Structure formats: structure tokens, C-alpha cells
């Protein structure tokens, strides 16, 4: 697996991790999105989070994840971003 593919795999693993942990903490999809992007309207924040979790109809790919968004998501969950990335990177390495 080349570095680009690995990076995309890590990004997708991060989104899945955050989605799962937000559900486990009892956040609704819209509620979580609004906590991550409080400057956006609730509808815009929900659309943004949905675009990261699912494939777009025009490209067939989910929206990419900015490091700033990843940091915000980790903060809402109360988990250190570096910790999440290390755990997910180790898991991805083992599944190569």
C-alpha cells in the first residue's frame, strides 16, 4: 500500500472512530456536528458531518477531513487527537 492510500485509509478510520464514539457518548449526529462547528448553522454543520461520513453523489467519495476539524472532533469527544491517530495508525499498520 502506498503512502497516499495509507493516508486515506487512516482518514476513513478516523471518521469511523469518531462516529462510533460520538454515538457511544449519546450524541445525535446533528448535535455532535453543531458542537464541532458551532459557528455554522445546525443544518450546515449536519450537512458537513454527513458529507464526511458518506460518499458524495457526484464524486463517489466522502468529503476529506481537515486537521482542524479532526482536532475539534477529538476535543468534543474529550480525547487527545494524537492518541487517536497513534491508535488508528497502529491498527492500520497491523492490517496491511
Label the model's feature ranges.
Residues 35-39, 90:
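Sequence/structural signature of long amphipathic alpha-helices
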Residues 28, 39-42, 80:
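Short coil/loop linkers at secondary-structure junctions
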Residues 65-83:
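DNA major-groove recognition helix of helix-turn-helix/homeodomain DNA-binding modules
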Residues 38-65:
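Recognition helix of helix-turn-helix/homeodomain-like DNA-binding domains
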Residues 75, 85-96:
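Charged, helix-prone or intrinsically disordered regulatory segments positioned adjacent to compact structured domains
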Residues 1-36:
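A short, Lys/Arg-rich alpha-helix, primarily the initiator
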Residues 18, 32-33, 44-52, 84:
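Conserved hydrophobic/aromatic packing and binding residues within compact polymer-binding modules
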